[in-house]
Every structure is written in C-alpha cells, then in structure tokens.
Amino acid sequence: MTRYTYLFILQIISCSFAATWVKITKPTITWEDMEVSLEGEKKFFCGEFDSSFTGRYHWRFNGSSILPERTQIHRNQFVFLAGANAIRNQLPGEYECCVRETLGNACYSRMIVVQNRTDNHNIDMTNSTLLLADEGNTYYIRMHDVKRVEGVKCTLDGVNVDNFKYPFLGRQTKKTVPYHLKIENIERGGEVNCDLRLHKKEIVQKTFDIRLLRGFISSSQLPQFVYLIVFTIIGYILRL
C-alpha cells in the first residue's frame, strides 16, 4: 500500500466518522443575562434531547478541547466559576458538547456573547486615595510625581496578587514612565499598599483603596447608587 493510498483511506474513514455526527445549534446566550448562583457561578446545560442520558459529554470551546480559564465541567453543565466575570473578554465564542445518544450522535452548539466588555483606563492617583473601578477592567495607575521608577511591589489587603504588576519591561525602567502600576482584569476591592523603588534604591510608599462598581445599575436603582457614591467620596474626604 502506497503512502498516498493510505492517506486516502484515512480521509474516507474520517469523513465517514464525521458524517455520523449531527450539529444542532441552540439559542445564543448573552453573558449579562445568565443567572448568578450564591457561589458566584454561572452555568448552562448541554441541551441534549435525551434527558436520561448518562454517558460521556465531550466539551469544546471554539473547536478546541482547551477550555477557558475559571471554568469547570459537571457532566452536562458548563460552569463559569466565581471570578470569571473579570476575564469575560476571553469567554465569547462557540461552546459545543457532543454526546452519543440512542437517537444518534449529536453535537449541541451555542454561542455566548458579551455586551459589557472590559476596557483599559489610565488613572492619575498622585493626589487621590480612592479608585472606583469596574470589575474586569485593566488600570494603569500613576501613584507619585516621580520621573524614574525601577519597580513596584504591591499588596491587596496584605496579600501579594498576580495581577498587580509593574507595567514596563526592564530595558524601559531607565526612561521616564507615566504609570507605575498595572492592575489587570481587576477582580475585587480592598486596601492597596505599594512600595515604589526609585533610582539608587530609594523607596516611596503609596496607599489607596479600591471600590468596585458592581454590575449594571437599573434606572430604579440609580438614585440609591448615586447617593452611595457621593457618601463614599465624602467619607474619604473627611478622612484626609
């Protein structure tokens, strides 16, 4: 058997196998409309026809078996874990689950779309101690009126966090930089304490608080939300 004959036979087998699977498109899901459990999770079901099916479920994301971060599979449920909203820009796409039911082999496909996508913001906090942030956004923060910074080390409520970083590469540290801290895909609020390492190992400190603006605000909630923000700001002014 020649190499080309072998490849031809494999192609026929592959096509025959693929033909036994039927793709069924389910309604699109909007991320913001999904219910959130008490544990902060969002989930959806495979949607198979046979509700008594107890076999294996094969899940794919955009055609790949590599699933997004902060997700889990519970048989016929795809679960977005608490904290997934902070990385929601990574989640839109096609989700498929394939099952071998008694009616036949089927792949149930649905799209998830995100309307309120995250964004990047540049913030000057040289004269501020409060950052009002939207969950999932990335913030570049200027903390002091200094020209050269060799690095920064920060804690959130006393704990080191991976998404608090110095936003520039080592070869750039000798240049004047406008921002000293990058908070990537911000997840939660709290008290931030930072040490900025300047030229000749001089250290300056910066302390500020992060408060998250949670979710969407309906028109009925808007007055209460405005009052909350106003009183929060007044409270911080009185503490200065």
Curated annotation (Swiss-Prot):
Keywords: Glycoprotein, Membrane, Signal, Transmembrane, Transmembrane helix. It is a single-pass membrane protein. It comes from the Eukaryota. Residues 1-18 form the signal peptide. One of its GO terms (cellular component) is membrane. The chain crosses the membrane at residues 215-235. Glycans are attached at residue 127. It is found in: Membrane. This is Uncharacterized protein ZK512.1. The lineage of its organism: Eukaryota, Metazoa, Ecdysozoa, Nematoda, Chromadorea.
